[in-house]
A protein has these predicted regions:
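Conserved acidic residues
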Residues: 30, 92, 121-122, 141
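RNA substrate-binding interface of SAM-dependent RNA methyltransferases
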Residues: 1-99, 163-171
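Structured adenosyl-cofactor binding patch, chiefly the S-adenosyl-L-methionine
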Residues: 130-172
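Secondary-structure boundary/capping motif
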Residues: 41-44, 105, 132, 153-154
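Short, exposed beta-strand "edge-strand" segments with a Pro/Gly-rich flavor and a Y/T-containing core
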Residues: 69-75, 100-105, 150-156
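Long, charge-patterned amphipathic alpha-helical coiled-coil/hairpin "stalk" segments used as oligomerization
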Residues: 95-136, 146
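Short, glycine/charged-enriched secondary-structure capping and boundary segments
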Residues: 47-49, 108-112, 138-141, 159
Length: 172
């Protein structure tokens, strides 16, 4: 969404791809899905990933390649859910994140749920711009409490939020 709560798309950035992939690999995430409906944006993201997986970057930095190998570019949330289900063998628990102050599950609650025997895989939905469209958020099974600092400023980049959330849910 944009600042006027209109549904829009935002551009994929190289930094978001790299940093989210690296944080995900660090915290043992088995897959990262970048969802974007615009073909040119998916092509852009794929070119970045392919550079590190198959081109010059493959030999140049094997650790970055390792992180980017788990990233998939898909057109829709349905595509991401279907692929995650295929990989894990069961539908993932969809976790909506938002910077807006709302009552949501605590990180301790979600972590316990994720670590419970027989727990389904978890898919954390992160948005850019001014948040996710309502139709995406409504599909989530659970709302996670926002990442909050000590002050009133709360507008993290998606890659910063991803790193913090992963540390709270998967960190030692």
């Amino acid at each position: 969404m944009n600042r006027n709560a209109e549904v829009v798309t935002s551009a994929i950035t190289s930094l978001d791809i790299h940093d989210i992939a690296r944080a995900s690999r660090t915290y043992g995430v088995r897959g990262v899905f970048i969802v974007h409906p615009i073909p040119e944006q998916r092509k852009f993201a794929a070119s970045i990933i392919d550079h590190w997986r198959f081109d010059f970057g493959r030999a140049h930095d094997s650790r970055r390649r390792e992180a980017l190998e788990q990233v998939q570019i898909v057109e829709s949330l349905d595509d991401a859910i279907a692929e995650a289900t295929r990989i894990a063998g069961s539908r993932p628990l969809l976790v909506h994140t938002s910077a807006r102050t709302a009552t949501g599950a605590s990180y301790a609650e979600l972590r316990a749920r994720m670590e419970a025997p027989g727990a389904p895989p978890t898919m954390i939905l992160l948005g850019t711009g001014f948040g996710m469209a309502a139709e995406i958020a409504e599909r989530a099974d659970i709302l996670l409490a926002p990442v909050l600092g000590p002050g009133d400023y709360n507008h993290l980049s998606v890659r910063s939020a991803a790193g913090i959330i992963l540390d709270r849910l998967r960190g030692k």
